[in-house]
């Protein structure tokens, strides 16, 4: 029994059968490229299915060396561990990758001189090749690919990685599937997607036009749980009579089977005329703005949208901003963000949080704790 992360509600005990553990481990044997004696740095908690399946069970069955990171995975600690271990595969959540790139890579590319050089095609290619090599070396220089999963990946960061042909891929799964649902090798991975249905799994979108109209993602196969422990009502809500697991995630699927997630159905908000608003898409834009570490978009009692923001205080203070200046910077971000949004999803106010938002073991924000602006 493995307990869900609890991003939209409190945790439930997921009953995971042997077939699901076998299917996930066999998936890893089918598509990952590890051999006996290979190395991996384990950064994810073993109490979470993502970490248990792909940072322990698979490697244990192959005969790999697993190095457990026993400290909080800051960029400095990760770089040190990877330089010593030189892992053959990297499994991570988006937050870890995003922090490394935001802190150590993007600032160097955003200097005035570098922006000018990047406009020259030949120099641009050379700079990107150099950045790619430095990034690969930062993760030990010996891995086949980085698998990112467990939460939504920042679009700007993903576009940057794709532009330098960095060997990364984004998977999709949930505790209820122990965890894998979708995956694609980095060489064939489509930007913005989370891959295709994993071996032995079926995936479809409940939509009249799955390529263009967002619908709920449902899946079926040996990875699917038996149900929630001592909770038949909750089980019946997510597994229908035909055995399809209703994930609660919303997305589209192209003709090749690539799935793109738009957000959680429980997170979706309604605009003044019934328009669908996906807070994750707005948060993705806001998180790329100056001095923003993380954010949550919520709907207030008056139906207007508010942004809860945890600023990147270290970066702001390093640039000489005091608390009043940070507040002003967040208001400027709100104004600039609204120029990129349709009228029905404009942000009415910003509330600054002094501490990081509470998260699940896989570093997803526990959104249900922050549904009111105080």
Language-model segments: residues:
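Active-site loops of AMP-binding adenylate-forming
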Residues: 18, 153, 162-166, 174-192, ...
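Conserved AMP-binding/adenylation subdomain of ANL enzymes
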Residues: 22-39, 46-133, 142, 167
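Flexible lysine-rich "adenylation lid" loop at the C-terminal edge of ANL adenylation domains
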Residues: 310, 353-373
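AMP-binding/adenylate-forming catalytic core of the ANL superfamily
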Residues: 221, 226-227, 250-343
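Conserved ATP-binding/catalytic segment of the ANL
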Residues: 197, 204, 211-271
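Conserved S/T- and glycine-rich ATP-binding loop of Class I adenylate-forming
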Residues: 4-7, 40, 90, 161, ...
């Amino acid at each position: 029994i493995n307990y869900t992360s609890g991003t939209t509600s409190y945790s439930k005990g997921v009953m995971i059968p042997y077939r699901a553990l076998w299917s996930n481990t066999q998936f890893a044997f089918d598509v990952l490229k590890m051999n006996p004696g290979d190395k991996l740095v384990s950064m994810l908690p073993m109490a979470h299915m993502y970490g248990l399946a792909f940072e322990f069970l698979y490697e244990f069955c192959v005969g790999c060396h697993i190095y457990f990171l026993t400290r909080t995975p800051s960029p400095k600690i990760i770089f040190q561990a990877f330089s010593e271990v030189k892992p053959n595969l990297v499994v991570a959540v988006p937050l870890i990758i995003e922090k490394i790139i935001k802190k150590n890579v993007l600032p160097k590319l955003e200097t005035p001189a570098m922006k000018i050089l990047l406009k020259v095609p030949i120099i641009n290619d050379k700079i990107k090749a150099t950045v790619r090599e430095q990034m690969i070396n930062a993760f030990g220089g010996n891995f086949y690919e980085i698998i990112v999963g467990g939460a939504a990946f920042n679009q700007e960061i993903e576009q940057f990685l794709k532009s330098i042909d960095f060997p990364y891929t984004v998977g999709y799964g949930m505790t209820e599937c122990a965890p894998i649902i979708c995956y694609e090798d980095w060489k064939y991975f489509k930007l913005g997607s989370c891959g295709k249905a994993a071996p032995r799994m079926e995936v479809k979108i409940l939509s009249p036009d799955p390529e263009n109209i967002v619908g709920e993602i449902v899946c079926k196969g040996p990875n699917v749980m038996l149900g929630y422990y001592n909770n038949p009502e909750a089980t019946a809500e997510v597994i229908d009579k035909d055995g399809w697991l209703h994930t609660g995630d919303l997305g589209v699927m192209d003709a090749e089977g690539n799935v793109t997630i738009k957000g959680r159905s429980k997170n979706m908000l309604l605009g003044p005329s019934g328009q669908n608003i996906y807070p994750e898409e707005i948060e993705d834009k806001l998180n790329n703005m100056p001095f923003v570490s993380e954010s949550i978009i919520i709907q207030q009692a008056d139906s207007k949208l508010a942004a809860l923001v945890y600023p990147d205080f270290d970066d702001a203070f390093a640039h000489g901003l005091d608390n009043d200046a940070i507040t002003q910077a967040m208001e400027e971000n709100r104004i600039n963000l609204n120029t990129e949004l349709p009228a029905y999803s404009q942000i009415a106010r910003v509330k600054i949080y002094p501490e990081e938002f509470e998260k699940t073991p896989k570093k997803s924000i526990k959104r249900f704790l922050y549904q009111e602006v105080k």
